Amino acid sequence: SSSKMRYVYVDINGDHIDELITEPGYGYLTQAIYSYKNRTVKTVAAVGQGTFTKYYPKHKVIYIKNSGHMGYLCDYYYKQSKTGVYKLVAQVGKDYGSRSYDSKPIKTTYYIGNKKTSKAKYSQYIKKMLKGEKGKNFSSLKWKRY
């Protein structure tokens, strides 16, 4: 039945240990990523109102495109910290107001950390962080249901 949760095991951070990604499908928790280390399961990343888009194992980065609702969408970059948890390092806020999402946003705001920045500085930061790594699509993983 369609009420079964989707999940997949994949090594998203290049440490040769698979993480578990689940898709509970709630508005506040669309997808979550769990790691297993020292016999402990830990939530390392979660997304509400959207889905994980790409992961960059070499640079331990996760990208989420178009997360949000009510006319405001964000693109997020998370980088894995020393604790294993992914921390938000950069984001773009796109305000559509009452426009449809296929038109251009009324206003776009760029952030590195929690500081506003220019589009050029944001792009430069992302480029430097990923160093040309192509990234892999979460959508092309072999999802299962249980």
Predicted regions and their residues:
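Beta-propeller blade termini
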Residues: S3-I12, F52-V61
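Extracellular and analogous surface-interaction loops
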Residues: Y9-G14, K79-K82
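Beta-propeller blade repeat segments, especially FG-GAP/WD-type strand-to-loop junctions
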Residues: T30-A45, Y77-S81
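Short, surface-exposed coil-to-beta transition loops
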Residues: I17, G27-Q31, V47-Q49, K65, ...
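Acidic/hydrophobic-patterned starts of short beta strands in beta-sheet-rich repeat architectures
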Residues: N13-P24, H59-I64
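Acidic, small-residue rich beta-repeat scaffolds with periodic aromatic anchors
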Residues: H59-Y146
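Blade-edge motifs of beta-propeller repeat domains
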Residues: S1-S2, T40-F52, A90
